[in-house]
């Protein structure tokens, strides 16, 4: 991921940047996360249809869905630590918390998942790895309810902690980073980022 520019450290504020690409490997989305801070943002003009993902080169019938790029990469790391080949299945982040409608049946399938299912018609199973909090559980319920019945949906939240990054930290005996609730910010340029810090 680092070698191909999908994940990098921004030079100005030293934030982690997770890049979502289109089919021609053009950047279309960038999630920005503070390193050692609770900062969360995304680049102006980001298209959530192209959120951070890792797709297999060969057709695969399963897609794993996460709230964030960090959870996706934490899951991949856990798979690797367990001796499993994490590159054998499609991995997709939602670029943040999914907000279902008040009436769950009126919710929509997340844009990134709609695009992925169109790109990969061979997918039959969707594994939801959303957070172990009220919002994550509600999102799981809503997505499960609105997905077409042709898909098998599995709910596999982390066994410990709030999310897969917490689970990875627990497995590695690392401190879990405290996250403050803060408004998500959209960034365009260095000056804009400086003003928001």
Annotate each predicted stretch with a short phrase:
Residues 1-49:
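Basic, glycine-enriched DNA-binding surface that flanks or lies within the catalytic cores of DNA
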Residues 71:
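Conserved Rossmann-like nucleotide-cofactor binding loop
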Residues 59-63, 125-126:
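Short active-site oxyanion
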Residues 18-20, 63-66:
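Short pre-functional
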Residues 79-197:
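TOPRIM fold recognition
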Residues 67-68, 132:
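Helix N-cap/beta->alpha junction signal
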Residues 49-59:
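A short acidic-Thr-Gly-centered motif at the start of a beta-strand
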């Amino acid at each position: 991921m680092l070698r191909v520019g999908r994940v990098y450290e921004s030079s100005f504020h030293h934030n982690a940047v997770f890049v979502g690409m289109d089919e021609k490997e053009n950047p279309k989305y960038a999630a920005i996360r503070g390193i050692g801070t609770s900062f969360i943002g995304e680049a102006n003009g980001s298209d959530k249809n192209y959120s951070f993902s890792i797709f297999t080169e060969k057709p695969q019938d399963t897609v794993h869905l996460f709230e964030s790029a960090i959870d996706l990469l934490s899951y991949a790391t856990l798979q690797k630590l367990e001796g499993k080949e994490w590159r054998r299945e499609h991995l997709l982040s939602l670029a943040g918390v999914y907000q279902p409608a008040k009436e769950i049946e009126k919710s929509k399938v997340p844009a990134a998942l709609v695009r992925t299912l169109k790109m990969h018609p061979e997918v039959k199973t969707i594994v939801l790895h959303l957070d172990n909090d009220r919002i994550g559980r509600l999102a799981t319920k809503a997505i499960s309810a609105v997905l077409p019945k042709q898909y098998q949906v599995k709910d596999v939240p982390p066994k410990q902690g709030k999310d897969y990054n917490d689970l990875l930290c627990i497995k590695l005996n690392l401190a879990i980073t405290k996250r403050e609730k803060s408004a998500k910010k959209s960034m365009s340029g260095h000056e804009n980022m400086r003003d928001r810090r």
